[in-house]
Amino acid sequence: MNKAYYIGLMSGTSMDGVDAVLVDFAGEQPQLIATHTEAIPSHLLKGLQRLCLPGNDEINRLGRLDRSVGKLFALAVNNLLAKAQIAKEDIIAIGSHGQTVRHMPNLEVGFTLQIGDPNTIATETGIDVIADFRRKDIALGGQGAPLVPAFHQQTFAQVGKKRVILNIGGIANITYLTGNREEVLGFDTGPGNTLIDAWIQQVKNEPYDKDGEWAASGNTDQQLLAQLLSHPYFSLAYPKSTGRELFNQAWLEQQLSEFNQLDEEDIQSTLLDLTCHSIARDILKLAPVGELFVCGGGAFNTELMQRLAALLPDYHIDTTSALGVDPKWAEGIAFAWLAMRHNLGLPANLPAVTGASREAVLGGRFSAK
């Protein structure tokens, strides 16, 4: 059988590395051939975190970081291909998500901005790059996010089976597959790992709470949890999407100002419950019973998975491994899939999910020639 190799590149709101995946789309189901994570150097990470906050001299910083992130993404591709021992000539295209530095779709003139110059990726890898997937959807009146539900529908939908696919990155999003292949819902539920990562980084200088152990050692403060859950985002009707613009360290500090007496591990436990409760509430609104399959970094947080199970007693819960897709690489595979859709001239957004006025071919092509 002929191969249909595409590469997917993803760096999410967690900014915990660039995931690069090599996927073969020749068969009915995507086949994961090789994977690689490229660490984000600390100087680049600091620059990106600064750019995500309001500040001065942003245009110079944006321009420099756009190129630097492009070079980092290209390095991820070249290392992936070296590891897989596959020639660049065998790759049809790279699908690059880029690094989101602003996502503000609800302004009068909404916009989203991802950096990681695709021209740089194309020239440094010698492979055509398909990128800028979100802005066409926004131009059509949509949120530009989440985009993964279209991939979830194609890969995980089964006639007659109600399934929820939960992707927990920095932000969490859900896809509700109703059992009718044509019908799908999806939206961002709110914070995934972003606040629990930010708090442990601030207090313990650790990148993330492994297995949720620190959160498990604390006790949730119900008053703080109720205050956090009163954020207006949680009561918005979908389609909706969010990011660091709403849920960030500055917002967290503001929320904690009246809770100085709390132990640090109790705050961590409360933040984990914010993630779990906001996800569970939205899932229960869609269907009281069903199957839940989890992917993204959150799938590996044992405490998070246990708390979700307790909040969703009538759900059968597993990771997407049970459906044949490695939960760690699911989002990277989705962006390889988006590149494949663009290459074939096929639409890749779901208006019922994003609120766009119509389906559209997403992204632009940046030639390596």
From Swiss-Prot:
Membrane-crossing residue ranges in chain numbering: none
Superkingdom: Bacteria
Disulfide bonds: none
Pfam families to which the protein is assigned, alphabetical: AnmK
Signal peptide: none
Chain segments annotated as coiled-coil in the UniProt record: none
The UniProt record lists the keyword ATP-binding: yes
Keywords (A to Z) from UniProt: ATP-binding, Carbohydrate metabolism, Kinase, Nucleotide-binding, Transferase
EC nos: 2.7.1.170
Gene Ontology biological process: 1,6-anhydro-N-acetyl-beta-muramic acid catabolic process; amino sugar metabolic process; peptidoglycan turnover
Catalytic activity of the protein: 1,6-anhydro-N-acetyl-beta-muramate + ATP + H2O = N-acetyl-D-muramate 6-phosphate + ADP + H(+)
InterPro entries cross-referenced by the UniProt entry: Anhydro_N_Ac-Mur_kinase (IPR005338), ATPase_NBD (IPR043129)
GO molecular function annotations of the record: ATP binding; kinase activity; phosphotransferase activity, alcohol group as acceptor
Membership in a protein family: Belongs to the anhydro-N-acetylmuramic acid kinase family.
Job of this protein: Catalyzes the specific phosphorylation of 1,6-anhydro-N-acetylmuramic acid (anhMurNAc) with the simultaneous cleavage of the 1,6-anhydro ring, generating MurNAc-6-P. Is required for the utilization of anhMurNAc either imported from the medium or derived from its own cell wall murein, and thus plays a role in cell wall recycling.
Protein name, UniProt field: Anhydro-N-acetylmuramic acid kinase
Originating organism: Shewanella sp. (strain MR-4)
Organism ancestry: Bacteria, Pseudomonadati, Pseudomonadota, Gammaproteobacteria, Alteromonadales
Gene: anmK
